[in-house]
Amino acid sequence: MFLGWERLVPHDTQLLALRYPGREARLTHAPFRRMSDLVEQILSATLFLEDMDLYLFGHSMGALVGYAVCQEMKARGRRAPSGLVVSSSRPPRGTPESAPIRTRSDASLCEELLALGGTPPEVLKDPATRELVLSSLRADYELLETWTPLEGPIDSPIHEIHGDADTLTEDDVDGWRRSTTSDFHSRTVPGGHFYLSDSPALATHCLTDLIRSRRTTNHQ
């Protein structure tokens, strides 16, 4: 999903991508089932960036992971990221609003994936591949549905971005607005939940704008 992004961000920006177990080349690796375990891994992996300006970008579940990382950094007294871009995601909530999605049938989860887009239908037709994909998806939902966000907003600016054909609402956008004590910006772009697969520049422009605005602020 993020291949080629290094050509779309400022030349003096180092782009690092996290590949979760249970994804792509790590599809056969056991996925995380608890947010705390995933956040701990990310915090360890980013220790060498402690003295640098760190910007986090998260799409869908990744947006909530990024937010959880910011919360934990704040709780531990680590330097706050210079910004967080949340893409195609509802804001963090303390308790699930409905029955756990991870307990749904395979057919129901396949319908969910196809409705969101981003997953070729032929992938779900192969039984072995479908089992791997759904196992990873159930783990993702378990991670989200068992996660209780820490109390209080983060101190990093948040830029929210979503497609105009996605199912996010104004209440969702307001939820993200309330999730930071710093600046907040929201942007609606053409497309659905996976708008960035077809038009990655829409997402990288948002990230670039955040980086440039923070650099301007820091030099004033």
Question: Which residues does each predicted region cover?
Answer:
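Non-catalytic, mobile gating and regulatory segments of ester bond hydrolases
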Residues: 1-220
